[in-house]
Amino acid sequence: MNRKDYWSPETNPETGEKFARVLEYFHTAHNGSADIDSMIDSPYGEECARRMQLRFKYEHDAMGEAAMEYYRACGLKKEMYDGDDYYARWVILTPLEMETEEGRKKKYPIVFYNHGGGNSIECEEFSLGFAELAGRDKFMVAYLQNTNWENFERVLDFIGEKYPLDRERVYLCGYSQGGYQVTSTYFRIPQKLTAVGPCGNDIYREYDNFNVPYTPEEIQNLKDALVPLMQVVGVCEASSFVPVNDWKPRKDWGRECSGETYLDDRRDDSKDPTRIHGGRRRFSDMPVPPEGEDKHEWMIRRLNMRMDTLNCEPRDAGTCISYLNTPEDELHHVLGFYGDKEEIAWHYGYKYYTLNIWNRDKLNAFRYVAVENNPHWPPVLMAELLWDFFRQFRRDSGTGRIVEEEYCYNRD
């Protein structure tokens, strides 16, 4: 099958309607700068399609034998809890080694992934790539339908009692609304987290998914706990998250389109515990610069709020704003700020603009990646990039402090 053939029912009778629905969404999920046609006809688009094809194969019977066999082939066991209640249900993937005598002697990290707004667990569990990583490197993965921080804490405590969880390595990530739910948990119970990845989000928000502001006490508690943070965004997202030195209103194409291809019959948005009911938006309000304030300086102040939570040196506003006028300085022009270690990496023919910042304690506390030509959709390799960042860290149970020590299953 040619690259573009995936995306049409005429050339892909089996799953083409699903691909066409996602393609329609792609065309409304960017800020006007993306070339979607070239994306789907590129090696990057081909890998995106391969992952989506996996999702389409299993999402309608995600607990069926075919899906279970897929997970066994990855070296994993899948279980669902509270499955009778659509919004209470959650899934855990565990390495098969956990069933062996030797494996039961070990402790296992866990990665929680928060789905996007309104999505079912099934919409993202197969296409992200966490299953292959978990089977290879031996860690657990959990997907919760209710991503509110109180439910996360409840499930985490349950897993800690029932499974051989390494409580020093609890990682949380998500995309879009799932990313803002990560941030909500990050501010409320940071001491229970090792590293986080709120992806497909702006650089900083002072309030949660329900527009509840974080309190001074919560902000100070977060700073005291220190949780390393990574963000992955698309260069062409509808909300224009990059460059970070500029602000633009979210692109409105005059219509709303969903990339969902699976809807559970039990779904009822009026009962969704993660949504605002009766508000201006289903989710939290978009930050807007105050009238009369320079939008570039406002954005750098927000960046430096993020730096402050990580004990990183603030970025110089003049230097960052100057990148608006330096297109020849590609990485800084695209990202709008600078780091301590920077690179333009290439994956599947696309540029991944990447920077790292070390904090005052010499900890690689912040990593930022923006993916060329990507709309508001989890970028290819997002899971791989997050895991590469997460696995560096553990939260020492004795001191409560973050330590850089890479996870390795076979380490004695």
Segments from the language model and where they lie:
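Alpha/beta-hydrolase active-site loop
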Residues: Q145-P164, S184
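A domain-start/cap signature at the N-terminus of enzymes
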Residues: M1-Y108, T147, C173-T185, A195-G197, ...
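Short substrate-entry loop that stabilizes the transition state in hydrolases
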Residues: M98-Y108, Y113-T147, R205-E206, S239, ...
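Alpha/beta-hydrolase fold nucleophile elbow
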Residues: P164-S176
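Hydrophobic beta-strand anchors of alpha/beta hydrolase catalytic cores
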Residues: V111-Y113, L229, Y368
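Extracellular low-complexity, Gly/Ser/Thr-rich intrinsically disordered linkers
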Residues: K362-R394
